């Protein structure tokens, strides 16, 4: 088996732990990232954590639309979340037990034209035998009003994460971009 691009003759050549795995430019409702299980860059088993950075907007009508994650095709109520949000006028919080996690809100088609939301999902300890935890930060502009959103979530499964489905409320608008990064264990001083 050949070494991934960031390893040369068995030595980690990149001093940083971040590895770009894949970038999608969706114009549909969902984006799936699936582990290649081949020892190469796309093989999730080599990473400690995963990070998804999204710059996106929904094509669906409304000021705000949701963006969520599901792991390993699990559509059951095996997720938990604590959310905090604010818009400069009011703040709120909620606890949920949904069929997905990583909730954030992105600008919908009723928002100011050409304004996209930023969303960062940090998914921790993806190959451990523990329940998987994650954090989400997002912010976006809307006509009803601008909002910042944070979530701490749990996937109640001990399985290693081998697939991540990024789901939008509606469809992603043209120009949206979703990038997946793997975080390697530190192997250099």
Feature roles, as predicted:
Residues 2-189:
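Surface-exposed molecular-recognition determinants
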